[in-house]
Amino acid sequence: VTTPTGHTVTPLHRNRNYRLLWTGSAGAFLGLFALETAMPLLILGTWSSAALTSVFAAVQTTTTVLCGAPAGWLLDRYDRRKLLVLAETARAAALVTLALALWLGQLTIAHVITTAAVLGSMQTVGTARMLLVRASVPDEQLTAAVTGEEVRNNAAELAGPPLGGVLFALSPVLPLLAATALFMVSAGLTWLVRLPARAQSPAASGEVLKGLTAALRERTMRAAILVLMLINSVAWIAQLVTIVLLRQHGIAPWLVGLVVAGFATGALAGTVLVAPLQRRLGPGALLLVVGLAQVPTLAGLALPLGPLWAALMCLCFGLGLPQVRVLLDVLVIRQIPDERRGQALSGVFTLLSLSLPIGMIGAGMLMNYSTPRTTLLTLASILLLGVACATFSRSVRTARWPGKS
């Protein structure tokens, strides 16, 4: 491929490092999304506790928050490829022990919660894959590479939940073993990646949060992060509540997985809307539109109209999610120097995850003392209130993309 400047670059499909990272990441994401359905089903089937499913999710996100800044520091100081291999191997090891305990009939709540902590802490190191991809392709191909990542992630999110549901229906141990194998495939392919040596920044111990403060220094990013935190937390909580709601109505596990896959189906379809919407709306206005559009879909999930209707609402909710992810890439990843990019990326993801633990526990308690439908309506109200407050900010409404006046 010849760029407008006359520089010849290797097509992405022939870029060895990119292919290895893309394929390995596809397996890792497929395993993660399969677990998102399988773990709540496992907990509900073993202990019949909706609150415990929320505790599992809350522990996972809490460890992600706590480990975010240290993980970013590690990613900027040490070999990102080796750190990613270590993270994938640790996740596989945790799931193997869980599968063995389940097979032997020795599964305990403490073991499940410990697994949640391992998965959450390694998730922060898993952001290394995003940085490795950017080191594998030239600037001219970065947009195409990011689009390829988005398609891969959404495809995995689409296939993962039904895969988790189907495997769980066959045997509760199968989704754990499948995710283990996929994590190990990812680790093996990542180990084969060969990149030029990167200049390592001798970061001091007091610089752990510098990447985050650099991201927050930008006006649009400060405003966007607040809305992104709300959209992100509501999206994850809504998936969990939907699973509990459908199971309470006797919907089969495999069908629950198909319904929840509607979130990913919408996100995959939403990738075609990224370019046209960004040509017409600034980043702040786009966030507000996405947030407002998701309110009626949350309320719609609360209507007792069956699994087909629920799948349609999940699909509509997911349409706006690619906009959120591309916004992060444009305003954070591309704007921060590589020597601080790990800290900035981990810091922003830490903030996005910050509201999840409280939200997950609150949703679990609300489901215990009321109903999943009430929980969904509460989420819709909170999202509406947050976006409505953000619309009063002129800096959010008039924010523009980098490079535009």
Predicted regions and their residues:
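Alpha-helical transmembrane-bundle signature of multi-pass membrane transport and export proteins
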Residues: V1-S405
